[in-house]
Amino acid sequence: QERVADLLNTVGLNPRVGRRYSYEFSGGQRQRISIARALAVEPDFIVADEPISALDVNIQAQIINLMLDLQEKYGLTYLFIAHDLAVVRHISDRVVVLYLGKVMEIAPADQLFDRPLHPYTRYLLSAVPIPDAVVERERGYLKLDGEPPSSIEPPSGCRFRTRCPLAKEICASVPPPLVEHAPGHVAACHFAGQLQ
């Protein structure tokens, strides 16, 4: 019971809540309990799959800050799986972009967000709202054409080719390898960095 109390305290919950039933907790409290459960085995590595997706914005910020504090305190490494790119940018050191189960790009977070090389990454980032209304109005959006292909029967070659404006014949026949374009920055595209 002492260990449970310590873990609950570590994630910002009063140890007395340990006697409650699960339905008595809010979403944020449940997430804190999930984090405490993960910490119970004293891990070095935690997989966090959409850890804040079902929470309101204030609680999201609290959970992200808790995760960052715990990372610093315990030297944790996270595999943070998320679709909220603003949060990904805030919490990540390195980012991997996937499309239909294949790696499109891997880079240090700052490089990926400032200088994306893969067309899919460029499209993803162009969809992220910018809080500055003037900048938001003036920036150009990249619009994807076509329908996403089937993940059960993905296209040959590059999986993004059916929606990519740079696609050529080679993209259908030769899956692009991950190629390093800058230190630690790799992209799987025959025409990486060419989308304007």
Predicted regions and their residues:
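Conserved ABC ATPase signature
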Residues: 21-25, 29
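Charged, flexible cofactor/metal-binding loops and thiol motifs
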Residues: 108-196
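Conserved ABC ATPase "signature" region
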Residues: 1-16, 122-126
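Interfacial catalytic loop of ABC nucleotide-binding domains
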Residues: 2, 19-21, 139
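Conserved catalytic motifs of ABC-family nucleotide-binding domains
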Residues: 42
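P-loop NTP-binding/switch modules centered on Walker-like glycine-rich loops
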Residues: 47-51, 55-137
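Conserved ABC ATPase nucleotide-binding domain "signature" region
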Residues: 29-32, 36, 61, 149, ...
